[in-house]
Amino acid sequence: MKLFQKIFGSYSQREVKRIMPIVDKIDALDSKVQALSNEQLRNKTDEFKERLDKGESLDSILPEAFAVVREVGFRTVGLKQYREQLIGGIVIHQGRIAEMKTGEGKTLVATAPAYLNALTGKGVHIVTVNDYLAKRDRDTMAPIYEALGLKVGVILHDMSQSQRQEAYNCDITYGTNSEFGFDYLRDNMVIYKEERVQRKLNFAIVDEVDSILIDEARTPLIISGEGEKSTEFYNIANGFAKSLEKEDYKVDEKANAVMLNDTGIKKAETFFSLENYADPENMEIQHYVVQALKANYIMKRDKDYMVKNGEVLIVDEFTGRMMEGRRYSDGLHQAIEAKEGVKVERESKTLATITYQNYFRIFNKLSGMTGTAQTEENEFRHIYGLDVIVVPTHKPIAREDFPDVVYKSAKGKFKAIADEIYETYKKGQPALVGTVSIEKSELLSDMLKRKGVPHQVLNAKFHEKEADIISYAGQKGTVTIATNMAGRGTDIKLGKGVVALGGLKIIGTERHESRRIDNQLRGRSGRQGDPGMSRFYVSLEDDLMRIFGSDRLQGIVEKLGLKDDEAIESKMVSNAIENAQKKVEGNNFDIRKTLLQYDDVINKQREIIYKQRSQVLEGEDLKNDVQDMIKSLINSIVDSHISGIEEEFEDEIVKLIEYMEDVYVPKDSVKKEDIINLSNEAIKDKFIDIAQKIYEQKEIEFTSEQMREIERVILLRVVDTRWMDHIDDMEHLKRAIGLRAYRQQEPAQAYQFEGSEMFEEMIYNIKLDTVKYLMHVQIERAPERERVVKNVITNQESDSIKKTPVKREKTVGRNDLCPCGSGKKYKNCCGRTV
């Protein structure tokens, strides 16, 4: 393979070679666009749109459009794109991932493909990792788009509904992955189409694409309402977990799982008074126990989470920041609260959910950019159909990457790191020190204080100062300790006299599970041809080496008889570290693939429900759909009641009539003798005929317009109620499905099969409820739509979107008669689910 690459070049090099003629065309137009006035450049937008309307493709106008953006960029923000930046822009337009090193100007690169694709009028989303970067990038690049007559907006967390609608209606919209995803879910929960904020999802350019599409892929977006379950059992299960001894359970650090062994199971049966712990009827107890074990023996305080003011806060494993407002799902957060002795919050009920994998796959075209993507190319290709093109740097990289230094113990390693920082500080050379956890950054900070080294520590709390601190990290004599990805998206520029000292020194205190995260830390130095250096310090006590490192390496170190403060550097050690990282990356990829397998089941179901919901919202005439629904329901009911066994036929007919009376048939209007001698098809026709007559009567009773709105009101309410219950049921199924492996069933296949059966059942119940309500409807006031659930929150931040008021007529009181005509009070009928 290496010989092939030497002769023919790598895949990226060959693809860049193919792109070069387009870059040459853009370059050739440079003098021509320089001669145009600002107004003439602005008019180019209208010209391009006309050409697209006449059938030209985006690819055919690309050279001119890119040349225009390049010139306008120079005139408005003083930045002219290099040839390498144009290559990156073309790669993005082609729906691929551009790997561009830190400092190569990715924010500017996105402007040309965003402009070109915005000409279609279908909108472009530019996705960043946080609100600060979204606003900064929008404010920085807006002059370019506005000079060309395009509108550019930004979505920020605390925006109102009308502000969001305005931002999404712009040609180009900046925002974060979570805001875009939650708006999509919320749009599919609205009850009036005017409340929707997003347009159809057209083209997304994802900045820091590896962070969003890979690191965040295991965290689904969840909108939830308050659940009904008691929290007391979390405390009971926690008491059980704490009573166990080491020999009662087994921790699998590779799989991040913990399970009871035989002695632990016996103790569980005694503790919970069970005959057989493994019985399916004990599934709920098993769930509480598993989460309590995970909370106590896997989740670590100040690494995975922090406790602050009586609240458990998640710490992002990649950025080291506290994620206020976000909670672990599936009861794990409650289990940690029980472990830490703080108030156990009620478990929430999932109302809407989607993974980033499935959200971003909705876009017609997806692309991205990052400094590090190549190590995950297989995953990008497999999950998203994206290939990674490494874009050459504008200037050669002058950073020197030294081999890893390996110590026997963490104590010896940190002493060596502190000594190295001290020597670097004395020399005046700036140092950026990357740590993997809050605990480690605080340990190192204490060591530096004792040595009298002034330094900045960045961990856990994201604030706008973070970008300033990181940007200052290249100044003379500065020492900055930060989690590996802190301040991502901010360039570190070297201060006066730093080049002569060797540039910014990067010190990694531990190898991360992913090579990509290590490469990101390294990439903070050596920006745009600047000098720099990097080195990682590793100990055999580090999690990576302890869990995934080879026994052979441990044996060699033992034989060498290394002391704590002695280090080794060797190719074999470096290879062992890289192999350990590859193992973890493969493991994590498998986990994400499995999660996607599960999510694809509910994703197909979600698409069907959201499409049906959208048709209802758009005000389509549902009369024919309702008629089909009635026929389909009646056919199903008759087929399920009549088995074809002659001796049971009479009894089945009686039960069928009783069931039909419960759904819509007026009592005693159909007698047993009326249908006992009819064929199955004739029985169906008779019941369909009764239903149509009742429906025709309703059409006469109300105006046709009223009847169409009644259909929409009822269908929306029924679909929302049933879908939310179904999501919850699917969550329970997923939780329990792992036990199928003990029955020689493949869990993912069992989930797919049973999930499909549950979906069919939900569709049947939607038809049943809709027909039932429609047949009994009696209106005393104009039909009005109401949300099924009113108080909802997201799993990322407390949901503070300000809703634009929509005028409503007076709502139905809880104790009023239900407008569906059942004769019951509203709170005991349709209002039961509100």
UniProtKB/Swiss-Prot annotation:
Cofactor names: Zn(2+)
Domain of life: Bacteria
Record keywords: ATP-binding, Cell membrane, Cytoplasm, Membrane, Metal-binding, Nucleotide-binding, Protein transport, Translocase, Translocation, Transport, Zinc
Protein residues bound to ATP: Q85, G103, E104, G105, K106, T107, D491
Cellular component GO terms held in the UniProt record: cell envelope Sec protein transport complex; cytosol; plasma membrane
Subcellular location(s) of the protein: Cell membrane; Cytoplasm
A Pfam family that the UniProt record links to this protein: SecA_SW
InterPro entries, alphabetized: Helicase_ATP-bd, Helicase_C-like, P-loop_NTPase, SEC_C_motif, SecA, SecA_CS, SecA_DEAD, SecA_motor_DEAD
Co-factor: note: May bind 1 zinc ion per subunit.
Entry membrane topology: Peripheral membrane protein
Catalytic activity: ATP + H2O + cellular proteinSide 1 = ADP + phosphate + cellular proteinSide 2
EC number: 7.4.2.8
GO biological process: intracellular protein transmembrane transport; protein import; protein targeting; protein transport by the Sec complex
Gene Ontology MF annotations: ATP binding; metal ion binding; protein-exporting ATPase activity
Binding site for Zn(2+): C818, C820, C829, C830
Main localisation: membrane
Family: Belongs to the SecA family.
Assembly and oligomerization: Monomer and homodimer. Part of the essential Sec protein translocation apparatus which comprises SecA, SecYEG and auxiliary proteins SecDF. Other proteins may also be involved.
NCBIfam families: PRK09200.1, PRK12904.1, secA
Role summary: Part of the Sec protein translocase complex. Interacts with the SecYEG preprotein conducting channel. Has a central role in coupling the hydrolysis of ATP to the transfer of proteins into and across the cell membrane, serving as an ATP-driven molecular motor driving the stepwise translocation of polypeptide chains across the membrane.
Protein name: Protein translocase subunit SecA
Encoding gene, per UniProt annotation: secA
